[in-house]
Amino acid sequence: MADDMERIFKRFDTNGDGKISLSELTDALRTLGSTSADEVQRMMAEIDTDGDGFIDFNEFISFCNANPGLMKDVAKVF
């Protein structure tokens, strides 16, 4: 599962800067299906625990560990 999380993080982090921006999260979630701007904002607020406007790898791992069922579904797509 750790390899899957790293692979998914890198797919979401399209510019390779080591963090996922709001626009990168939006693009990734669109791949998974229709997601409203409000849903993306809520998800970003939930995952971005330090409030810097980006999801770093540690925040991503924490979210994955708290939502294993969701991450299994995401791993199938990415």
Curated annotation (Swiss-Prot):
Q: Which residues form a coiled coil?
A: none
Instruction: List the SUPFAM superfamilies.
Output: EF-hand
Write out the entry's keywords from A to Z. Allergen, Calcium, Metal-binding, Repeat
- Which residue range or ranges hold the EF-hand domain? 1-35, 35-70
UniProt signal peptide: none
- Where does the chain bind Ca(2+) 2? D48, D50, D52, E59
What domain of life does the native source organism fall in? Answer: Eukaryota
Q: How does it assemble?
A: Monomer.
- Reported function: May be involved in the regulation of pollen-tube growth.
Instruction: Report the protein name in the record.
Output: Polcalcin Phl p 7
Question: What lineage, starting at the top, does this entry show?
Answer: Eukaryota, Viridiplantae, Streptophyta, Embryophyta, Tracheophyta
